[in-house]
Amino acid sequence: MWALDFLLSFLLIQLAAQVDSSGTWCYDSQDPKCGPAHWKELAPACGGPTQSPINIDLRLVQRDYTLKPFIFQGYDSAPQDPWVLENDGHTVLLRVNSCQQNCPAIRGAGLPSPEYRLLQLHFHWGSPGHQGSEHSLDEKHGSMEMHMVHMNTKYQSMEDARSQPDGFAILAVLLVEEDRDNTNFSAIVSGLKNLSSPGVAVNLTSTFALASLLPSALRLLRYYRYSGSLTTPGCEPAVLWTVFENTVPIGHAQVVQFQAVLQTGPPGLHPRPLTSNFRPQQPLGGRRISASPEASVRSSVSTLPCLHLALVGLGVGLRLWQGP
């Protein structure tokens, strides 16, 4: 069993290095010539009908009572194995998949069996003074967005996972800026200063319980689910997205530190701060957005007009019954 776990961990390390790692694309803030409008030229799936991110319109969501609570493994304790923080030129990634036992994973919550193993988490943010989340709830964005990327353990290769609609499960958390720092992000933010240029990776000086980055236990019951894609090329439609209703705070000074991370600029120019590393929202099309039993939904039709019509109909019916 130990040998099998070791082999799986090794494979996941290799697979994680391939997720969101292409260097042939960019964001508009880096160079509009290779920005999101051109991604479908590099990866045809980026122009497909089931792309991410999207706006979660609470008038369109449908309650789904099969969306039970998540079962988290390895999220409540700080692992002994070191974590790697990396600047890949497009975002900051925290690779957390070099574990030997009790590896972070999720199951339940309507996800297919057996489980989804955590590969990495990364962040999206805006330019100074602007919102930077990829998803939104009723058009409300966050200053940043955190993605926890998990891969279905029944697939043995990245190619297999990328080609299946249940290949990945990504947890999306909107981060809302506040004046006071959130100490749960301190270990990550303190490592940002060491990411002096794209391609640099450093070991974090300390690990922590991943659960500390998520909403509280009760708030984890409130989430939305839809089928979508990776939000960077190749944009494969292989993701079961979970967008939590409740946000997590992050300090203004901490957001500024992310906005100071260096990116790769156009040839001949010095690296400059990476900002606005988010993909524009994509059409929902005919997809369903499901709400967990505890999540908020909002009716698109007021009950008052319906009540008025019912009363009018009742009056007409009584007059017809009574005769002229």
UniProtKB/Swiss-Prot annotation:
Activity control summary: Repressed by coumarins.
Keywords: Glycoprotein, Lyase, Metal-binding, Secreted, Signal, Zinc
Residues carrying a glycan: N184, N194, N203
Cofactor(s) it depends on: Zn(2+)
Reactions catalysed: hydrogencarbonate + H(+) = CO2 + H2O
Function summary: Reversible hydration of carbon dioxide.
Protein name: Carbonic anhydrase 15
Species in which this protein is naturally found: Mus musculus
Highest classification ranks of the organism: Eukaryota, Metazoa, Chordata, Craniata, Vertebrata
Gene of this entry: Ca15
